[in-house]
Amino acid sequence: MSDNAPVLISKDMSIGHADFWRLFLKIDAPVISDQVSYQAAMRRCHFDWQGGSISVELSAESIRQIAALVLPQTDVTLRYADLSSTQIDEFEKKFERQFQRAGG
């Protein structure tokens, strides 16, 4: 275990809670999906990862409207504890890849 201070990373995402959890659990399956424990009506979870831990907290789900387009909106906070910057970068890359949307 490392003596690294916890690192908080916040993200503003256009996604609802159900879709977030469905995709999130696939990031490092089965490592995450086999041990994740939800708290606060599925708005938080915590799990061990590579000798440290990661906590995820979701804001209340809201709506973002851009002209006629209506999108779900959720603020996501990831808290990394006892992980090196290399490990955090690795998880962040997996996170971004999992939630990447096809664009054109």
Predicted features by range, described:
Residues 50-68:
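A short, structured beta-strand/loop element
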Residues 28-31, 95-103:
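A common structural junction motif
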Residues 1-4, 64-71:
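Short, flexible, solvent-exposed loop/turn segments with mixed acidic/basic and small polar residues
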